[in-house]
Amino acid sequence: MKQTVYTASPESQQIHVWRLEPQGTLTLLQVVDAPGQVQPMVISPDKRFLYVGVRPEFRVIAYRIAAHDGTLSEAGEAPLPGSPTHISTDHTGRFLFSGSYNAGSVSVVRLNDGLPGETVTVVEGLEGCHSANISPDNRTLWVPALKQDRICLFTLTDDGHLEPQTPAEVTTVAGAGPRHMVFHPSKPFAYCVNELNSSVDVWALSDPHGNIECVQTLDMMPADFSDTRWAADIHITPDGRHLYACDRTASVITVFTVSEDGSVLAVQGHQPTETQPRGFNIDNSGQYLIAAGQKSHHIAVYGIEGEQGLLAEKGRYAVGQGPMWVVINAFDA
């Protein structure tokens, strides 16, 4: 398995393409000058395309991924109805979802053989919409509306429309601000990081299309932290044993262990990281975590070590200005 890392730096309008070496170092392969401020990114399920949300002309650009080394070439684009804050796809690669914080909406774009096409549907009224997350069974789209302290639940139809589920939403505590989410790789649980109070909620999905319950909320900040809370991103290892979330004010990554059944998180430590970590990701082997410092203009690579999953820095690398997003692709070559 070979792995390629992509970092998006909107201030310099660049995508950096790196090879992740087996020992955890990065080798720069390519710098792509993008036609705008590149922010959210996602890799297609078949690993052939990298999709990038661009501002100020709101659109999604598809870059074709070279099979031999992961480098990029532009393949197509489509307009978006709002400024893209977060993008993702369904598991079949037929639809792309774009959440827009400023527009308070989520849109669905049809993908035609991997290339973005027409917008199928737009759902508005989602104040502070910060992500769109398809469930493991590809049926339910979870859409956190940060300003409304709720996560809206939609059924994805075969033609790409979104229909409110019953219940149509789950709510957090007041002032939490749900932002990004991940699903356990094999157990019926979801985890959501809350931006405004820097906490993580555990949602039990015993009946993922009906009875959804928050079974745990954990403070992710160090005990002596007293500044403004400003959480950003969350990811889980491929084996489901460790979960990580970052806070931008404290510039830390919080390390959690996950119980065997997925229902309980436990804080193991707080890793100081790059200044204002806006985004990070975990490689496909579960050995490395790569974090982007929006104010340090660097990325840092950490080894994930031991039963606790604590982080050990392996190196840091200058990227473009204001890096915000990290995605990692694995391929056979």
From Swiss-Prot:
Keyword Hydrolase: yes
Source taxon at top rank: Bacteria
The EC number(s) this enzyme carries: 3.1.1.31
GO biological process: glucose metabolic process; pentose-phosphate shunt, oxidative branch
GO cellular component, one term: cytosol
Catalytic activity, reaction form: 6-phospho-D-glucono-1,5-lactone + H2O = 6-phospho-D-gluconate + H(+)
Keywords of the record: Carbohydrate metabolism, Glucose metabolism, Hydrolase
Metabolic or biological pathway: Carbohydrate degradation; pentose phosphate pathway; D-ribulose 5-phosphate from D-glucose 6-phosphate (oxidative stage): step 2/3
InterPro entries on file: 6-phosphogluconolactonase_YbhE (IPR022528), Cycloisomerase_2 (IPR050282), Lactonase_7-beta_prop (IPR019405), N2O_reductase_N (IPR011045), WD40/YVTN_repeat-like_dom_sf (IPR015943)
An example molecular function term from Gene Ontology annotations: 6-phosphogluconolactonase activity
Enzyme type, top EC level: hydrolase
Matching SUPFAM superfamilies: Nitrous oxide reductase, N-terminal domain
Positions in coiled-coil regions: none
Record-stated family: Belongs to the cycloisomerase 2 family.
Protein's job: Catalyzes the hydrolysis of 6-phosphogluconolactone to 6-phosphogluconate.
Protein name per the record: 6-phosphogluconolactonase
Species this chain originates from: Cronobacter sakazakii (strain ATCC BAA-894) (Enterobacter sakazakii)
The organism's taxonomic lineage, starting at the top: Bacteria, Pseudomonadati, Pseudomonadota, Gammaproteobacteria, Enterobacterales
Gene: pgl
